[in-house]
Amino acid sequence: MAEEFLNQISAKCSVIIIGAGQAGLSIAHSLQKKGIKPLILEKNYVGFSWKEQRWDSFCLVTPNWQCTLPDYQYSGKDPNGFMDKENIVKYLKKYSEFVKADILEGIEVKHLVKKNEKFFISTNRGNFEADQVVIATGAYHVPNRHPHSERLPTNILQIDAREYKNANSLPDGPVLVVGSGQSGCQIAEDLFFEKREVHLSVGSAPRSPRRYRGRDVVDWLDRMGYYSMPIGEHDDPKSVRNKTNHYLTGRDNGREIDLRRRAIEGMNLHGRLEELTINDIQFSNDLSKNLDGADSVYCRIRNSIDEWISKNGIDAPKETKYTPFWEPNEDVKGTKLECKNLSVVIWCTGYKSDFRWVDIPVFDGTGIPVHERGVTQSLGLYFIGLPWLYTWGSGRFCGVKDDANYLADIISLRTNKSAATKEMMECKALLGS
């Protein structure tokens, strides 16, 4: 049915959703429950980013029981496990079949503008008009790289995290992974387990326990209300949206990542990447500081769980205090890596948003959407699926349903109000004739 829209030069819709990921599908389902049938425009296909922009051994870092899309709770045999990318794609596709929304795949939105209270969308396959628009394209669009990355010799392959698949897909030789967030640490481990020579540039990313005092840490944090805490109640609401996620893994049925252990086993750790030339790469002498900082967050999480257990009188097994068991021997000037000893550099330094196609003044000076729980100052324009849209869970499988239901209420109210206004105007016209 959705393909019928392409037969029109300018298709008109009540609500258009841009993006058919978990956020777009969730808001579509919530709207349909209120009698509103939206149209979803998807640049690629359902599940694309999970299938094509994740490495082969990728797994969720949160347990499967947290996959709670609207009216579609995970129902598999391993609620405490961690879905691999193949099963994540299956989960999303099955949810798409459950939602039964009108989805146009292969539609890339080029321009969105608002005129006379209507939204006009230009795409690679035609134009669309809508009364209300929901942008569900996420926040991670353009990879970050060091500004001097082009200085590296051309014989060194440079790729971003979303381009990495497995160790065998890379040329032989040593690999430098830049960035120690979730992607960087997990990719470095993936290569290390395949006996590759791995160099990891460690930044200030925090790390998290995997299991503690008898439960997965996600279970404890969920019980403590962290995933449902509104951003306004956070200690640092201004910067929390930009903070790096804690590193740990869902691989091997879930475990911690302790870079000190990997160093003992032979992984080469360096401080933050400082400078690049055609001959060598210079790292800062902050490796000890960065490892200590990650451990400090790790211990704070454990301590907060201890306090909550004590406060609520919960019977849980005790665990010993964490003690670092490896320290780097750093030179005052940091370490240096010669380019001739490298074959690949993988940039795991995050992504930035790119909403330049949205020609509506709803952004701050850095291109980030300004909104109140997804509602912008432009009447009828919304965002969903952004990190910390409202809670920590907003950008995850566990919290998007609450945002979807919230926005569906607002969209429905405005749809009904618009319909009532139109009906009143038609009645007045008839009475006046």
Named regions from a protein language model:
Residues 2-20, 25-52, 81-433:
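Flavin (primarily FAD) cofactor-binding/catalytic cores of flavoenzymes
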Residues 45-71, 262:
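Redox-cofactor-proximal catalytic regions of oxidoreductases
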Residues 75-80:
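A short acidic, helix-capping loop that chelates divalent metal ions and anchors anionic groups
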